[in-house]
């Protein structure tokens, strides 16, 4: 083949790829919907897809440019989505007319074991059945028992911190990457509360559960690239029978749960963890659950809890070191709680009574939302109208919907001075002024996160123990502008969550 022929072949392939990459970009033509010009392959998500900005920043900036439109077209890579910018319309779609938008965006990975059986991926009646069974698992009574397991992990974390190397001889302070610490904590909490396994990743960071668990975080590395390919070219991804996660690692968690269930049934053992609660739920359910369906509900902890719970603690600690007056007020509440407990470990009920802690965490979830957006899928044709009955838009079955959570959270019309960390927004006096459907830290409607209590419980427990023993200060390596330095799906600075802990004793 001559050089000219090779060039022609390459040019043809390039042209076909370009045509394919832009093949969905006419989706909004003739639908009376404003949209910004998308880039080939990357749509309106170029900066986050290329790791130039966080997904939160990308969505927030897009929202700011288009918020004067109640609805706007958005291209998430090649996928056309209809973004809802108006809180009242969000209520209509996600709550009032939920039956038209009951599912999340389709994630079609037939070769991926467990993923399709997770609650947040399930659809229609299958999801409804599983949701009704799992909802009692996350009640206060069940969380109260599970909190005792978390306390063991908090204690292990504090022991590890006590052995940390001081900055200099005679100093009572040391520097650490809070993200590394909290990832280990999240790992151990998930191990004990979801999988019935006791591990100590502080003393043994190379333990099997931690080593394999880290491979399931798809917000970075090879899993991130595979996930992007799955979204960008699902047919190609499935044609080659690719998977996001290594099948050997997935099998490890399957065996862990199945073996634990068999052992407990054989020896009549009970433990207040997720496996036990699922075993009890299975007995009461009319559905014949498969082992994979049970394992998948434990497996989801790595998707919904591992990174998110760790990030919630990190972002809150970051704001506390930047706002020492808020940190001092929180410390006073923590001391009062400790005195009321008379030296006993923190309990679930005592954690619930810490109102200022609630305010601090709520504001952290507002400013540094764990999820940049929520999504829905239109199940049947739907005419969207305003309160006066005026037609706004015609949705078609198969339309993907985007709810810009971080955009709403940073909108000064709803949260004045949104860049300011102000827990008072969530005080008893002021939280009644919040506009409904503008604060959505765990999603909205029946499809909202079922494990929100679990996430807040872990954050409260860790922050209580941290504040009780240490003052959090900035270190030379502390990120100055997290909004600009964060990358990927989560708010994680590229340099890490470095800070300094100063012992209070």
From Swiss-Prot:
Query: Which superkingdom is the protein from?
Result: Eukaryota
User: Known EC number(s)?
Assistant: 1.14.-.-
Q: Name one GO molecular function term.
A: heme binding
* One GO CC annotation: endoplasmic reticulum membrane
Record's bilayer topology term: Peripheral membrane protein
Is the Endoplasmic reticulum keyword given for this protein?
yes
UniProt keyword Membrane, yes or no: yes
Which cofactor does the UniProt annotation name?
Answer: heme
Q: Which keywords has UniProt assigned to this entry?
A: Endoplasmic reticulum, Heme, Iron, Membrane, Metal-binding, Microsome, Monooxygenase, Oxidoreductase
Q: Where located?
A: Endoplasmic reticulum membrane; Microsome membrane
Tell me the residue numbers annotated for binding heme.
Answer: 449
Cross-referenced PANTHER family: CYP9F3-RELATED, CYTOCHROME P450
Q: What does this protein do, in the record's words?
A: May be involved in the metabolism of insect hormones and in the breakdown of synthetic insecticides.
**Name of the molecule in the record:** Cytochrome P450 9b1
Q: Which organism is it from?
A: Drosophila melanogaster (Fruit fly)
Q: What gene is behind this protein?
A: Cyp9b1
């Amino acid at each position: 083949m001559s050089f000219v022929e090779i060039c022609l072949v390459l040019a043809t392939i390039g042209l076909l790829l370009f045509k394919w990459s832009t093949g969905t970009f006419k989706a909004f033509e003739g639908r009376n919907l404003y949209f910004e010009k998308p880039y080939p392959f990357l749509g309106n998500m170029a900066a986050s897809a290329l790791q130039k900005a966080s997904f939160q920043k990308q969505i927030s900036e897009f929202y700011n440019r288009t918020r004067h439109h109640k609805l706007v077209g958005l291209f998430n890579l090649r996928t056309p989505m209809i973004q809802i910018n108006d809180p009242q319309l969000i209520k209509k779609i996600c709550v009032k007319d939920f039956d038209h938008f009951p599912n999340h965006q389709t994630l079609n990975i037939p070769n991926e074991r467990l993923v399709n059986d997770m609650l947040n991926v399930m659809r229609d009646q299958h999801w409804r059945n599983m949701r009704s069974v799992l909802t009692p698992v996350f009640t206060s009574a069940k969380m109260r028992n599970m909190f005792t397991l978390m306390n063991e992990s908090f204690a292990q974390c504090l022991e590890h911190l006590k052995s940390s190397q001081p900055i200099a001889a005679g100093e009572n302070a040391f520097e650490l990457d809070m993200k590394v610490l909290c990832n280990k904590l999240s790992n151990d909490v998930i191990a004990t509360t979801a999988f019935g396994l006791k591990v100590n990743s502080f003393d043994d960071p190379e333990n099997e559960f931690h080593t394999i668990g880290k491979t399931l975080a798809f917000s970075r590395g090879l899993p991130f690239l595979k996930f992007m390919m799955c979204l960008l070219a699902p047919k190609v991804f499935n044609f080659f029978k690719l998977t996001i996660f290594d099948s050997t690692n997935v099998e490890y968690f399957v065996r862990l749960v199945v073996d634990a269930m068999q052992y407990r049934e054989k020896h009549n053992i009970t433990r207040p963890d997720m496996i036990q609660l699922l075993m009890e739920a299975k007995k009461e359910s009319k559905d014949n659950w498969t082992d994979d369906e049970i394992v998948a509900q434990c497996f989801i902890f790595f998707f919904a809890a591992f990174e998110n719970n760790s990030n919630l603690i990190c972002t809150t600690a970051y704001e506390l070191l930047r706002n020492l007056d808020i940190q001092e007020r929180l410390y006073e509440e923590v001391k009062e709680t400790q005195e009321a407990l008379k030296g006993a470990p923190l309990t679930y009920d005592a954690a619930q009574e810490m109102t200022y802690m609630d305010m601090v965490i709520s504001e952290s979830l507002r400013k540094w939302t764990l999820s940049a957006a929520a999504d829905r899928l239109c199940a049947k044709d739907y005419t969207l109208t305003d309160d006066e009955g005026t037609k706004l838009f015609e949705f078609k079955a198969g339309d993907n919907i985007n709810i810009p959570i971080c955009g709403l959270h940073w909108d000064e019309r709803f949260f004045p001075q949104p860049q300011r960390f102000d827990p008072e927004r969530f005080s008893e006096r002021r939280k009644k002024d919040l506009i409904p459907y503008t604060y959505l830290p765990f999603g909205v409607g029946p499809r909202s996160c079922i494990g929100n209590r679990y996430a807040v419980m872990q954050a409260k427990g860790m922050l209580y123990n941290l504040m009780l023993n240490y003052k959090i200060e900035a270190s030379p390596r502390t990120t100055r502008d997290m909004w600009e330095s964060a990358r990927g799906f989560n708010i994680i600075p590229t340099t890490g969550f470095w800070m300094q802990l100063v012992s209070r004793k």
